[in-house]
């Protein structure tokens, strides 16, 4: 699936659509440059999971946990120096757990993710809009 988002609200709405479709054990990798809208997408995804809490970027905390229809494990692995760091934050329990695991910059730990991982790419277009691709 490929779509174009014309605003932060559009990006969040697309996230909500995806969040409503996710099931227990889903793993989602978000790819995109800095400020491409990854966390904005996760805010919508969380709404689709019935989560009402404020969603913030886990860039410095590395992992945030939210509770809704399913538990959301929101990770940002951009700052991790090694796969060992990925294991140290308890990522394996999140990836192979019963909630939904969303990993920003997840391509950095792709070797540790299941085959059924969904990849969502956000790309900033020349006009400032975002192209969102789900694979």
Swiss-Prot record:
Native source species: Treponema pallidum (strain Nichols)
GO biological process terms on file: tRNA threonylcarbamoyladenosine modification
Keywords: ATP-binding, Cytoplasm, Magnesium, Metal-binding, Nucleotide-binding, tRNA processing
Binding residue positions for Mg(2+): 39, 104
Residues that bind ATP: 35-40
Family listed: Belongs to the TsaE family.
Annotated NCBIfam families: T6A_YjeE
Pfam families linked to this entry: TsaE
The protein's name: tRNA threonylcarbamoyladenosine biosynthesis protein TsaE
Molecular function via GO: ATP binding; metal ion binding
Domain of life: Bacteria
Subcellular location: Cytoplasm
Protein's UniProt keywords contain Flavoprotein: no
SUPFAM superfamilies from the UniProt entry: P-loop containing nucleoside triphosphate hydrolases
Recorded GO CC terms: cytoplasm
């Amino acid at each position: 699936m490929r779509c174009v988002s014309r605003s932060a609200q559009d990006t969040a709405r697309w996230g909500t659509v995806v969040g409503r479709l996710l099931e227990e054990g889903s793993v989602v990798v978000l790819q995109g440059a800095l400020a491409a809208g990854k966390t904005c997408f996760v805010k919508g995804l969380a709404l689709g999971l019935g989560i009402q809490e404020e969603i913030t970027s886990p860039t410095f905390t590395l992992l945030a946990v939210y509770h809704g229809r399913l538990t959301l494990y929101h990770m940002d692995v951009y700052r991790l120096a090694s796969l060992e760091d990925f294991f140290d934050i308890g990522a394996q329990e999140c990836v192979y757990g019963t909630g939904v695991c969303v990993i920003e910059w997840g391509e950095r730990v792709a070797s540790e993710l299941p085959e059924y991982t969904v990849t969502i790419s956000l790309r900033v277009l020349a006009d400032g809009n975002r192209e969102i691709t789900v694979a």
